[in-house]
């Protein structure tokens, strides 16, 4: 449903862009959604309403693609400072292409919580975080691990936050 804080809304394609692989990704996702997910009827109306609204409001759209009404993708021309306000639901995604992942760093703020990644080495991500002084994104996790919970969540040590220490002297 893409309603959780860990749900994907934006896909950033970084590096050398392969259009065939990108299309294959979206088609595979659409086919998987058709096989494994029964969306409520209202979701189609909500998704189409969002789509029409975005077509009117968003001035930096590069292209749009609809995959069997299961997946909608809106490719953006730029990674703007208000990107975190773009929220997709019911198989509705925004996407952005960049040759260099560092280009998105200046617009990442504290509203970003989790970045799931595929095709990046941990050292590359660490360099991205340190060299760009990233102010947001508390978790960088591989695709498929966004719901994994640990003692540190969204930058907070849950164990310390949810326990108290009683001192007797």
Question: For each of these PLM feature ranges, what is it?
Answer:
Residues 1-116, 126-167:
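NAD(P)-dependent aldehyde/semialdehyde dehydrogenase
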